[in-house]
Amino acid sequence: MARITVEDCLEVVNNRFELVMMASKRARQLANGVQPLIENADASDKPTVMALREIAARRIDNALIDEVEKAERERAEREALEWAAAEVVADEDMSKNDD
């Protein structure tokens, strides 16, 4: 695959700070298992490179990154609530067995 450069990404994102923030957030999402939005993604690419490729290809923007973060946060909260509910049920079962 062609080499991606910061200049390629700066054609899409206005400044370097914003580019770094977008790329780091997206790379974290990719590292945590979110599927890449570019076709023919090279499996050997590290998450940071994949994030930069998505930005340069105009497949990702701040709104989409925020949407994915929100969905991941809601999923984590839901799992935490389910875990807590399961612990309460287990504690109740154990206290019934103690009686």
From Swiss-Prot:
EC number from the UniProt entry: 2.7.7.6
Superkingdom to which the source organism belongs: Bacteria
Disulfide bonds: none
A Pfam family assignment: RNA_pol_Rpb6
UniProt catalytic activity: RNA(n) + a ribonucleoside 5'-triphosphate = RNA(n+1) + diphosphate
Example of a GO MF term: bacterial-type RNA polymerase core enzyme binding
SUPFAM superfamilies assigned to the protein according to its UniProt record, in alphabetical order: RPB6/omega subunit-like
GO annotation, biological process: DNA-templated transcription initiation
Keyword vocabulary terms for this entry: DNA-directed RNA polymerase, Nucleotidyltransferase, Transcription, Transferase
GO CC field: cytosolic DNA-directed RNA polymerase complex
Enzyme class: transferase
Gene3D superfamilies per UniProt: 3.90.940.10
Subunit structure: The RNAP catalytic core consists of 2 alpha, 1 beta, 1 beta' and 1 omega subunit. When a sigma factor is associated with the core the holoenzyme is formed, which can initiate transcription.
PANTHER family associated with the record: DNA-DIRECTED RNA POLYMERASE SUBUNIT OMEGA
Functional description taken from the UniProt entry: Promotes RNA polymerase assembly. Latches the N- and C-terminal regions of the beta' subunit thereby facilitating its interaction with the beta and alpha subunits.
Family under the similarity heading: Belongs to the RNA polymerase subunit omega family.
Name the record gives this protein: DNA-directed RNA polymerase subunit omega
Native organism taxonomy: Bacteria, Pseudomonadati, Pseudomonadota, Gammaproteobacteria, Lysobacterales
